[in-house]
Amino acid sequence: MQISGMLTMTVLSVMLVICAPGRSTRRISFAKARWMMAGGTGLIALQFLLQHAFGFRQMGVTQAVCCNLLFFTPSSLLCSMSILYMQRQGKVSWKEWLIGSSIYALSAGILIGTAVLDGVPFREESMALRIAEYVSSVLYVVMQTYIFSMQYKAYMRLETAVDEYYDRSRRDLFGWMGLSMKTMALMVFLVPLVIFMQGAPLVIFSISFFFIISYSTISLYTYGVSKDVERVEEAEMSEEGIVKSEKFAAATESSLLSSAGANFSLFTIHSTLNRWIESGHYREHNLTLSIVARQMGVPQKQLQEWLRQSEYKKLAGLVSSLRIKEAQRVLIEHRDWSVESVADYCGFNDRKYFHQVFQQYTGTTPAKFQQNN
């Protein structure tokens, strides 16, 4: 198991370092994140190598736990921070790095200092080292909880930006982040309990951790070299532009401008929405907030504000509602059309998503709706 784990982690590290396309490595967020993830998987490979070479698990739990914590903690730090880098487009402050690194430095200092000063040979069981390991495992939980809190905030911000920007649910773009965060957070709280065990619980934990890190690594690589990262960053940049616009408007302290903007939003969007609907633009594929705002001839910021205050809440709500109404009409008037043809005509990218949204709005499937009407 140790040899296979070491080889797998080595392959993952090499994949991140060597196999990334040039266009992806020029993207700041992925360029840094892949090196951090490669460092994390490399440390795990080194940990497996030391465990196998010196037989720590066979010598006793104390030595194995000490080795695990010394390598497992910085590995988790690097892997977790690499995901945070992707979430924030590389915008991680030195203070945030310093806090995480300081916690690890304290943990490593306690372990190494105890092993050197307690007077007990490392190959023998040591109560002092065991206590130091308990303290170190608690520090590990503190470090990972701190990072997870930052990841969660960044994930929620991305989720909001993407949900409001695209014409349909796009969790497929960054869903791996949420799964990686949740599974790694679960492993974090199991570490202080499982790491001191032997037998089946430790084996199950080790295998689970191995697969979680592998999944996160492969997902980060796939995401980094795909177009998905550009789509997420486009939505995020749009949201940041709107926020900056709001701050600038607030800084002007001009009630006249604010009033004019509000009147523009209320009057213009309502008057242009019907023209936009009549034009059939809502049936176009892959609409975004910026595209719709340009088609309607209104500022993107005010369109977003109007959507938030309306019954639709976001662009996907507006577009999906219009597309489903159109789909109902087409299903009745063109009974010879296939479901795929109806979905494509109404702007849905695939049949599965069309079925999902249609059932959500009507409570039935397209086929049953057509039979009953």
Predicted regions and their residues:
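Alpha-helical transmembrane segments and their membrane-interface junctions
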Residues: 57-63, 118-121, 185-202
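Membrane-helix interface motif
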Residues: 112-122, 153
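Hydrophobic alpha-helical transmembrane segments and immediately flanking/interface helices
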Residues: 69-78, 197-221
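N-terminal low-complexity or simple alpha-helical regulatory segments
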Residues: 1-110, 125-128, 135
